[in-house]
Amino acid sequence: FHYRAAETAAKYKLMVDFHGTYKPTGLNRTYPNVINYEAVHGLEQMKWSDIHTDQVTYDVTMPFIRMLAGPVDYTQGAMHNANKRCYHSSMDTPMSQGTRCRQLAEYVVFESPLNMLCDSPTNYDREEECTEFIATIPTVWEQTIAMNGEIGKYITMARRKGDVWYVGSLTLSLIHIS
């Protein structure tokens, strides 16, 4: 399916984002129109995840493992956020674990040429500063530097587009980095 879809899309000069599929295996080298793969426990999973799901730890682990295979269609950008103690699954008002700033940092840390929005448009209307940042952040970078990190604890990435640098950092909820 993937090869046929990529080939057909290329024939018609269309880009492909394989959402809900396995990790990249090199198909995008043959078909550069394939720009993204999900293959992660993306944020939409939090709608039905139970209180034992630790998305914060997952988010500081995934870049070291899954992202090595290629771009990630993660669906970040939740505007309704809670700490682990207050988090609960909800189909009506889904939320993320962590903070809104954490959600914004994921746009820098996670490599994704086609970023998604996981939340309701009305939530973005209420958070104008966040929405402006998401709308203007580049999705393709000229330079990337992994500044520091430890699997499952923290990660800091710096990415440059033109003369502008963006720095994003994700940590565990209770970690202190000196």
Model feature map: region roles:
Residues 119-166, 170:
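Glycan-recognition and catalytic regions of carbohydrate-active enzymes
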Residues 93, 102-121:
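Catalytic domains of carbohydrate-active enzymes that cleave complex glycans
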Residues 16, 109, 167:
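Conserved, mostly hydrophobic/aromatic
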Residues 13-20, 43-48, 115-127, 141-145:
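Acidic/polar loop patches that form or flank catalytic/metal-binding clefts of enzymes
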Residues 1-95:
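Aromatic- and carboxylate-enriched substrate-binding clefts and catalytic-loop regions
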Residues 175-177:
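Conserved small/polar residues in nucleotide/adenosyl-binding loops
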Residues 2, 9, 98-102, 127, ...:
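Active-site-proximal structural scaffolding
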